[in-house]
Structure formats: structure tokens, C-alpha cells
A protein has these predicted regions:
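Bacterial N-terminal signal peptides that target proteins for export
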Residues: 1-9
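C-terminal motif of bacterial Sec signal peptides marking the signal peptidase cleavage site
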Residues: 18-21
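C-terminal functional module detector
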Residues: 23-73, 77, 84-126, 130-132, ...
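Aromatic- and acidic-residue-enriched carbohydrate-binding clefts of CAZyme catalytic domains
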Residues: 126-157
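Ser/Thr/Asn(+Pro)-rich, low-complexity disordered segments
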Residues: 136, 207, 228, 275-277
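Active-site gating/metal-coordination segments in enzymes
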Residues: 154, 222-225
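Long, charge-dense tracts
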Residues: 217-219
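Conserved, charged catalytic cores of large soluble enzymes
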Residues: 222, 232-238, 320
Length: 624
């Protein structure tokens, strides 16, 4: 993101579980991490922006291990803190700048089992499966890997690999790693894991699996579940929520973050139960609302905000679309857009909240990486792939013949942004749970968004505008109650200091019409330069990208954009939701950087340039 100037069966099987019996008791092993009870030196009443990654896999995830990843949770934390770590390519990888918070989220299914099978001190090393995994016969080991992968999507686990005491020890090691790297006021870590539900459609040709994955994040490390609830316990998210409610009743604070909605084939935001197929009711709505306050909307396997089919009048809807399901062989079938994207879900929530008595699709936004190298490759000019040796080199990633995994279609990943008083577990967790969050496609763009009534249009020029914003309006992620006239919104964004300038800020408005149907509209509200709206459209900001050198210049765009905007179409009788989209000027995509490295022309698809972006969480207006 720096400002630059002048396969095989194994491949197929990892797709099934890529992401992307449990006793319900608190862990008996208490963390030694000290509870922070005093404010840190970075404490701010008007809150600071913190950037993090809540979706990272290590060798303790099956689908990382099979591609030769051998790095650990400690490596993952070191990488995010700015240190170099080993990469399967043989070259070290290093993040350009440290992040502020992170969680290792290895798959709950067979968590750490693969590493145990190659550990001579583990009893799993003598298992029949371990002998096959470590067999010098390549076909034997591949078949073994395949059987393990299929057992996850089919929900038919190998009993010999589900030994509770081993799983408990591995889980405790993940918790301990989080504690080792927690530095209150400087760097925050969370215990977490991925629940990897991928219900399949076996009758299809070819059979495929649909993504229902969630990452589960814990507030504390001394109050966590004994072992994770996995998709082997249930593939139904509603059962996950019931389990989470039970854990919460024991003083364990946690929430789940859905991701890769784009690969759910319409299940993630279905109008009926995702697995049960039952009609939605108030219990469903309140349970989902309680357990899933934020959704991951941008990551390596694509952006789940919206799709051109669903938003045909949005010129920026076609951004990093990865429209596939998981497949057993060949080219993955397309994931149907209907029910698979966030904007449509927000609209559906507005339409159904009166009937259900609650809005099940009321959530904030974050991004994350889903990197499987103990690292997220979120920088376009520092991209090293997602999944071990399958995409470890540029020539592997952008080969024209690439079909399985569609590696060239993968994004560089996203980041989670949160506004919090300080960089501690409690403060960051509160910010996430309260939905005062924003997502980015990788750059560290900061976004502020407040909504209220009777806001002075000159408020942003006041030195204490932030204090006034919090006192006179509500921040992103919350509700506006009815007021006089039309609502006004305080809108502010500043560029990433090491990335591209800003093109524009847009307000995306969603509302429930008089006919009960939900609608959408995109407003350009502030932009760089002296462009004028022509025939209802703002002209392009321009383009400084040089494809041959994979470079651009910041000679266009703005460092900061801000405004107070009043909705000119407001109808007080209509429920509505508003969120921001902040666009950078065009920059080279990672695949263009790879092509430059190889001294070849970039692939014809996907686009050679992109406009990186950030999205605020919504603000809702309820007419009643």
C-alpha cells in the first residue's frame, strides 16, 4: 500500500474447508495476564482508530498444514507486530507497519492435529492416519489429506483424531500465545478460533459446499470455553448461537463474526433458517443480533459488500468479487448473489424488522485477511499469497492456466478498524461489540461517521468537533431516534499516510418504502478537486497508474475529506440505514505488481488497477 513512483486432489480438498463434542465449562487453566483496571497513556475520550486482523491461520489449521505451512501462533503475532517470519517460499515475509490488535483463528475442526501427527512425542504420531499422512508415497499422503478434508464438509469426523485432551491442550496453547503477546496500551490480542461449517450439496454436479464460516472471539483469556464448539458439534449457526448463549451465562464474553458471505450460495442472508429452512421468527432475530454484532466484509476470498447483479446502478459495485462456492473438482460453481451480500442483507433486515420484532441483519463491518501463512498479505505491493506453497510465488499466482482456487481472483485481504478509548482488550472488544467499526480493503484509511438532528453545517471547523459530535449525534453502529426535520451526518475520512490519496466519500442509503420493499441509493457527498456533478454523476478522479512499472503518483486526490451532509430525500415514516464508502484514487492491483516482478503483461482478468476503499458501519433510523 505504499505510494510507489517512477492441482491436484489436495488443492481441491482444501477448498472444502478453507476460509475459511464440547463440554460447556470455563477453562480450568486461568490466564496469568494482568487485568487492566487503569487507563493507559494512550486513552482518549473521543477515541482512537485502531487497525487489526481478526482472521489469521497458522500450521495448526489443517488447510495451512497440507501446503507446507509450519509457522505457529507466536509467528503470527510476531508478524503483525512488524517482525519478519519464515515463509514456505524460503524468503522471509514482513508487514510494512505493525497492526494494533489481532486474533489467531485456527479452524476448530482438527485444531493442531496435523502438527501433532508429525510430533514423535504425541500419541497421534502412531495413529494409522499419521502413518498415511507421513508416508513417503505421495499418493498415499494425498489421499489421507483428502479424506480428512472431506470429513469436515461431510461432518463425518475421524474419531481417532478427536481426542478431547489433545484438543484441550492445543486450545490452551493458543490462549497462552495470546497472553504472551498482549501489551496493554500498545498491542492487543484475543483468543479465538474459526467454526468451519460448509454444508454441502451432494446431489449437484459437481457436488459443492457452501460457506457458513464464523470466527469466534473472546473478550478475556481467563474466561474461555474449555474447548471450541466446532462444526462437528453442529453445522447449524443457530446451534452455535445457543452454545454461545450458554457460555455467556457462565460469564464467558464472546461473539461470532461471519465471513465470506459471497461464497455462501445465498445461505448467509437467507429469508429462512440457514440450515433448518424454518421461517424466521423473533427468537432467530434476537439470537443472531446478540451473537453476531459485526460481519467481515472484505478479505482474501473477495469482498461481500454488494454485487453488480444486486446493485446495477452502482458504478463501484464490481470490486474484488470472488463469486465461487467450494468444489470437489474442477472449476468451482458460482455462488448465487441473492442472499450472499451485505447490502442486500441490510435492506432485508429493514423490511422484516416490524414483522419479527427485531432486525436479524443489523450489524457493523470489519475487514480481515484470512491469511493461512501465519500472516495476512494485505499490502498490494507486498503480496505473498494466501495458502502456503500453492501460491507462494508470483508465477504460481498469476498463471493464465490457473483454474482451481482461482488464485489470481483473490484479493490482498482487508483490515478491521475500530474506534476505542485505548488499546486494551476491554476497550477494543467494546468497540467491536458496539459496532463502532469500519472495514478497509487493506489501506489504513480512518473513517468517522455520526448522525443526528440540527447539526451545525460548520461543526467540522470547530476545534472540539469530535467532542460535539459525540454529544450531539450518535456514532456509526447505532440508532437514531426520530427528530425534527431531516437528519444530518458528520462525515470525515483521512488517507493512509503510506497509501493513495482519497477520491470521494459516498453515502449509501437503504430504506423501506411505503410498499414494504427496500431500496438503495448512492450519494456522492464530498470529493477531491473541483469536479462538478454532471447529469447526476460525478466525473472520475483520473488515473495516474503506470501499468508497466506498477506505480502511481499522488498528484490527484485529497489527503482528507469531510462534510456535514443532510439527507435531501428523507421521509420520516420510512425506516432507513446509512453507511459510508470512502474511495482511494486508482492504484495497481497486486497481480499487476506480480506481473512487473516477472516482467510480463498482467493477466487480462481481473482488472489491472483497483480503487481501494473503506466502509463505515451503518447508522439506522427507526421511524417508530
Amino acid at each position: 500500500m505504499k505510494n510507489l513512483t517512477p492441482l491436484s486432489l489436495v488443492v481441491v480438498l482444501a477448498l472444502v474447508i478453507m476460509s475459511s463434542s464440547c463440554e460447556k465449562q470455563a477453562s480450568s487453566e486461568a490466564s496469568t495476564t494482568e487485568v487492566v483496571t487503569e487507563k493507559t497513556s494512550t486513552y482518549s475520550e473521543t477515541k482512537n482508530a485502531y487497525f487489526g486482523d481478526l482472521h489469521i491461520h497458522t500450521s495448526w489449521s489443517f488447510d495451512a498444514f497440507i501446503y507446507n505451512v509450519r509457522t505457529t501462533p507466536d509467528d503470527a503475532y510476531n508478524y503483525v507486530k512488524g517482525l519478519a517470519i519464515d515463509h514456505v517460499s524460503g524468503k522471509p515475509i514482513q508487514l510494512g507497519r505493525p497492526l494494533d490488535f489481532m486474533a489467531v483463528t485456527d479452524h476448530a475442526e482438527y485444531m493442531g492435529v496435523m502438527m501433532q501427527m508429525i510430533d514423535p512425542d504425541s500419541r497421534l504420531a502412531t495413529s494409522e492416519m499419521a502413518k498415511r499422512i507421513t508416508s513417503p508415497e505421495r499418493d498415499t499422503s494425498r489421499r489421507a489429506f483428502g479424506e480428512i478434508g472431506f470429513s469436515i464438509s461431510r461432518n463425518e469426523p475421524f474419531p481417532e483424531l478427536l481426542q478431547k485432551d489433545i484438543m484441550k491442550d492445543v486450545w490452551q496453547e493458543i490462549i497462552d500465545a495470546a497472553d504472551r503477546h498482549y501489551e496493554p496500551g500498545k498491542f492487543t490480542t484475543f483468543a479465538g478460533y474459526e467454526w468451519t461449517s460448509s454444508p454441502g450439496v451432494r446431489t449437484a454436479n459437481p457436488p459443492f459446499a457452501r460457506n457458513m464460516h464464523r470466527n469466534v472471539i473472546y473478550r478475556h483469556t481467563d474466561r474461555v470455553s474449555e474447548i471450541p464448539f466446532s462444526s462437528f458439534d453442529s453445522q447449524d449457526p443457530e446451534d452455535l448461537w445457543k452454545w454461545m448463549d450458554h457460555e455467556r451465562s457462565k460469564g464467558i464474553d464472546l461473539f461470532a463474526i461471519p465471513h465470506n458471505q459471497n461464497m455462501s450460495d445465498g445461505l448467509m442472508y437467507d429469508l429462512k433458517g440457514m440450515v433448518s429452512g424454518k421461517a424466521l421468527d423473533n427468537t432467530y432475530a434476537t439470537s443472531r443480533l446478540r451473537n453476531e454484532p459485526i460481519h467481515e466484509v472484505s478479505q482474501i476470498k473477495g469482498t461481500s459488500m454488494t454485487h453488480p447483479v444486486l446493485s446495477p446502478n452502482d458504478e463501484f459495485a464490481d470490486f474484488e468479487i470472488y463469486p465461487f462456492t467450494f468444489v470437489a473438482s474442477g472449476l468451482p460453481p458460482a455462488s448465487q448473489p441473492d442472499g450472499s451480500y451485505v447490502r442486500q442483507a441490510l435492506k432485508r433486515g429493514l423490511a422484516m424488522q416490524d414483522d419479527l420484532g427485531a432486525n436479524p441483519f443489523k450489524f457493523g463491518f470489519i475487514g480481515s485477511s484470512d491469511g493461512h501463512n501465519s500472516a495476512g498479505p494485505v499490502e498490494e505491493d507486498n503480496y505473498f499469497g494466501k495458502l502456503g506453497n500453492i501460491d507462494m510465488l508470483p508465477e504460481f499466482r498469476i498463471a493464465e492456466e490457473n483454474v482451481v482456487l482461482n488464485r489470481v481472483r483473490m484479493s490482498a485481504g482487508g483490515l478491521a478498524g475500530v474506534w476505542a478509548n485505548e488499546n486494551t482488550r476491554d476497550a477494543i472488544f467494546d468497540g467491536l461489540q458496539n459496532r463502532e467499526t469500519f472495514a478497509t480493503s487493506g489501506p489504513r484509511i480512518q473513517v468517522r461517521f455520526f448522525g443526528g438532528w440540527g447539526i451545525d453545517k460548520d461543526l467540522l471547523s470547530a476545534p472540539d468537533w469530535l467532542t460535539k459530535s459525540y454529544s450531539q449525534a450518535v456514532p456509526m453502529g447505532t440508532d437514531m431516534k426520530p427528530g425534527k426535520g431531516a437528519p444530518s451526518f458528520i462525515i470525515w475520512a483521512v488517507k493512509d499516510a503510506e497509501s493513495a490519496n482519497l477520491d470521494r466519500i459516498q453515502v449509501i442509503k437503504l430504506w423501506k418504502g411505503a410498499d414494504g420493499k427496500s431500496q438503495e441509493r448512492v450519494f456522492d457527498v464530498t470529493w477531491s478537486g473541483d469536479r462538478q456533478v454532471q447529469n447526476g454523476k460525478l466525473p472520475s478522479v483520473g488515473n495516474t497508474v503506470d501499468i508497466a512499472s506498477a506505480s502511481y503518483t499522488n498528484t490527484i486526490g485529497s489527503v482528507k475529506l469531510s462534510t456535514v451532509w443532510t439527507d435531501p430525500t428523507f421521509d420520516p415514516s420510512q425506516d432507513a440505514a446509512y453507511y459510508l464508502r470512502v474511495l482511494e484514487i486508482p492504484t495497481p492491483r497486486w497481480s499487476t505488481h506480480d506481473a512487473h516482478t516477472l516482467d510480463i503483461a498482467p493477466p487480462s482478468d481481473p482488472p489491472k488497477i483497483i480503487q481501494e476503499r473503506a466502509w463505515s458501519s451503518p447508522i439506522w433510523y427507526n421511524s417508530k
